[in-house]
């Protein structure tokens, strides 16, 4: 029996749309996430 295809099919546009900076900035919670990552000194804030 085959397992089927892999579920992760990379796509940069979809990645940015779902987890990107602009999306994070839309909501208060998203802005809090970015602020937390800035505070922690993350090299990459969002996808």
From Swiss-Prot:
Membrane-spanning segments: none
Protein family (similarity comment): Belongs to the bacterial ribosomal protein bL34 family.
GO cellular component, one term: ribosome
Any GO MF annotation of the entry: structural constituent of ribosome
Gene Ontology biological process terms in this record: translation
NCBIfam families documented for this protein: rpmH_bact
UniProt name for this protein: Large ribosomal subunit protein bL34
PANTHER family assigned: LARGE RIBOSOMAL SUBUNIT PROTEIN BL34M (PTHR14503:SF4), MITOCHONDRIAL RIBOSOMAL PROTEIN 34 FAMILY MEMBER (PTHR14503)
Keywords, comma-separated and alphabetical: Ribonucleoprotein, Ribosomal protein
UniProt biased composition (Basic residues): 1-29
């Amino acid at each position: 029996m085959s397992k089927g295809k892999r579920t992760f099919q990379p796509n940069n546009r979809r990645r940015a749309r779902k987890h990107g900076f602009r999306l994070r900035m839309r909501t208060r919670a998203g802005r809090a996430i970015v602020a937390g990552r800035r505070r922690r000194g993350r090299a990459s804030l969002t996808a």
